[in-house]
Amino acid sequence: MNKIAYKIYAVLKNLICSVLFFAILFGTLAFIAPLFRYEEDEISTGNLSTFYAARKESVDVVFLGASSVYRFFMPTVMYEKYGITSLNYSSAGMAGEAMTGLIDEIIDVQNPKLIVVELRDYIKWTGRVKEEDYDKDKWYEAQYSYISRIVNNMPVSKNRAKVIHDTVPSLLGDDELDWQFEFLKTHNNWKDISFSDFLSFARKELSGEKEVINLNGKYKGADYKGNLAVSSVDYNESVDWSDFTETKEIEPERLEVLDSLINKAKSVDTEILFLTTPYPETETLAVYENFVQNYLEENGVNFFNCNKKVKEIGIDFASDFYDKKHTNVKGAVKVTEYVGKYLVDKYNLEKSNLTEEEQKEWQSAADKWNKEVLEPGVKKIEETVSKHKAKGSTNY
């Protein structure tokens, strides 16, 4: 071998070794990075882990969105009433910017017959006051938490990378590098990780084992396929926007988010339905919701506005909510049953094709939830309302 050939060989050898070294290094860091993630709230972690623990193609419908999903849709109610399996891919404050990547994630992981995308949180941040009128620190802190609750519970994938790309620069104004290579952001947590934690993590990752994560036993949906219902009650004035047609156009930058969702819905084979759940809406938001409905329908995309159907659903604003935005167990059952029937009829959904073991698992979760949450919850709500009436309250 002459000197020139030897030099070329040496350079190529060093280059290949360097590439292999960094490939192994980054591969190892990517593999162990989830071990160092911050613990997030039990609802987001529980909801998303419930989704990932399900056998692929065992779920007919996935509801995507913020708390306006997990406080309104009860999977076991849908199963008992219609024989349809559903799960909630939801976390508090989920931004519309995250949803295109999450639609791909849901299809890749579960491939359901239908994805229902709830848009109330998207509309909530539409038409608000200018950014300079907000407390920027509080805005940053809130959005940081909302994004973390999603991506910290996702496996490393192109879809996770897209969610980060679509949210971190636009909502936080941050460089996405630390989020994409999350070891840069979380490596300081090493001191909280024990060797047994590492062994347990490695065993689960290498085996492909998936389970519902119940942080400190606080995730109340762990035994109920993600059902998260509250048994308290808060009085709200009755509202009815069924005949209200006024609209107000949303800002261009928010319209871009909606356009991306429309394009995504049209580009996938999976059926996509956009929806808003019912609540004591104000006129300030109703005009934007009407605009969004018209815009989606004009673009050939399906939209179901529950705020136009409160009478049909049977919503009682005085006793079906536990705060101004979310249904309690009594209201959640009403919404689940009504929307469930709409989905079954519109999309010709048939009973789920489950294994015998899965059928027993779903029925067991339904029975357990009915006994431990639904029955005592409705009873507690009715007793609370009765006490208010006995005290002379005119609200009930």
Give the ranges of each region predicted by the language model.
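C-terminal regions of proteins
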Residues: 284-367, 371-391
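Secreted/periplasmic serine-hydrolase-like ester/acetyl group-modifying domain
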Residues: 136-268, 356-396
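Acidic-and-aromatic substrate-binding clefts and catalytic sites of carbohydrate-active enzymes
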Residues: 93-97, 248-254, 280-287
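Catalytic nucleophile-elbow at a beta strand-turn-alpha helix junction centered on a G-D-S/GDSL motif
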Residues: 58-72, 326-329
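Membrane-embedded segments
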Residues: 64, 68-157
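Alpha-helical transmembrane signal-anchor/signal-peptide segments
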Residues: 33-57
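N-terminal Lys/Arg-rich, disordered targeting/topogenic segments
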Residues: 1-12
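Hydrophobic membrane-insertion alpha-helices, especially the h-region
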Residues: 10-34
